[in-house]
Regions:
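Signature tryptophan residues that serve as conserved aromatic anchors
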Residues: 51, 55-58, 120, 126, ...
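Active-site helix-initiating loop/hinge in glycosyltransferases
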Residues: 50, 93, 324-325
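Conserved HGGG/HGGXW glycine-rich cap/lid loop of the alpha/beta-hydrolase fold
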Residues: 32-33, 38-84
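Catalytic active-site module of serine/aspartate enzymes centered on a nucleophile-bearing elbow/loop
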Residues: 308-341
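Hydrophobic h-region of N-terminal signal peptides that target proteins for export
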Residues: 10-17
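Short acidic-hydrophobic surface loop/beta-edge motif
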Residues: 23-29
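Flexible "cap/lid" subdomain of the alpha/beta-hydrolase fold that forms the substrate-access gate
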Residues: 18-22, 33-34, 80-116, 120-309, ...
Length: 341
């Protein structure tokens, strides 16, 4: 068949027919066994999920980037899914988590990668990028903006407590006490995931939205709504996948990310004043509650990230950016990757 005919035929094939197969395997990194999902061949892109999620949160991004000629890898992060989950919160500092991603790049035989992170994955991504600028050549942050650490300050958990009026608590404060939140969240994983995914999403009634500040006499599931109908972006089989994994593992691993914040703060004073220097794309939903309480970081992003390629807020989109608006995220992601060449 003539070369031109082959190219024309490829152009007419649907995306699914052109997309390499999604594969799963285990690798040893940084002292743990890590499960990864991977797709495609080419330059490496690593996708880092947040709380309470899994590699599965990138299910719409993996095939799009793979079809465009990238080797795309989405791990179950430390403490999640099929990856090892050490019990000690001290094993979940950002230094440990960044080390995991460095290990992924090495295990796959690469010297460089583009790193993307959503929610808790964003701090992992920008910490890894700041510590290893030789390895991570560009950064994509979803939901959580980068902020330059200032001089002085107090431990994160103390700062959270001081910001709250009497009788109120920040959700991350509620997560600090071992055994409390994990017992509540694990009581019915399917209901938990349904409520969390719905209540932090965009384009839902105001009264249904997640309250990240709540009474000291309340529990975290008191702050979210169990929907009568799922939003269009969320399918029953999606909830089933998450629920099956969390029913097996519990939520302790993910909660340990919050419980290690003070230790991370004490370990990373050397990053005071450090800006994020790599080319960076930031995407968030206009309805994302994180955009509300991280407004300072968002407003100063251009100063904190001198090579910010673009800052995009997607209308009608909430916290679960790449799940709620995969077409927009994939388009922006691919445009950004193209700009790096």
């Amino acid at each position: 068949m003539p070369k031109c005919a082959i190219l024309c035929l490829a152009a007419m094939l649907p995306l699914a027919a052109q997309t390499p197969e999604l594969k799963h395997r285990f690798i040893q990194v940084n002292g743990i066994k890590m499960h990864i999902a991977e797709q495609g061949d080419g330059p490496l892109v690593v996708l880092v999920h947040g709380f309470p999620e899994l590699w599965y949160s990138w299910r719409h991004v993996l095939p799009a980037l793979a079809a465009a000629g990238y080797h795309v890898v989405a791990p179950d992060m430390r403490g999640y899914g099929q990856t090892d989950a050490p019990p000690d919160p001290a094993d979940y500092t950002l230094l440990k988590l960044a080390g995991d991603i460095v290990g992924v790049v090495h295990a796959l035989g690469y010297e460089q990668a583009v790193i993307a992170g959503h929610d808790w994955g964003a701090p992992v991504a920008y910490t890894a990028a700041n510590l290893r600028p030789d390895m991570f050549r560009a950064v994509v942050l979803l939901s959580v903006p980068f902020s330059v650490r200032g001089e002085g300050g107090i431990k994160p958990t103390e700062a959270m407590r001081r910001m709250m009026p009497p009788g109120k608590q920040f959700y991350q404060t509620y997560f600090q006490t071992p055994g409390v939140a994990e017992k509540e969240l694990a009581s019915d994983p399917k209901r938990t995931m349904r409520m969390l995914l719905y209540s932090a999403s965009g384009s839902i009634p105001k009264q249904d939205k997640w309250r990240y500040i709540f009474g000291t006499d309340e529990k975290v599931l008191d702050t979210v709504t169990d929907p009568q109908q799922l939003p269009a972006w969320l399918k029953p089989e999606d909830i089933d996948y998450y629920a099956t994994e969390f029913a097996r593992t519990g939520f302790r691993g993910g909660l340990n990310y919050y419980r290690s914040q003070d230790l991370t703060w004490s370990e990373t004073g050397f990053l005071i004043g450090r800006k994020l220097l790599q080319p960076t794309l930031f995407i968030a939903g206009q309805d994302d509650p994180v955009v509300e309480f991280a407004k300072g970081g968002l407003d100063n992003l251009e100063k904190s990230v001198p090579n910010l390629w673009k800052k995009v807020l997607l209308p009608g989109v909430g916290h679960w950016t790449e799940q709620e608006a995969p077409a927009d995220v994939n388009r922006l992601f691919l445009e950004f990757l193209k700009s790096l060449k």
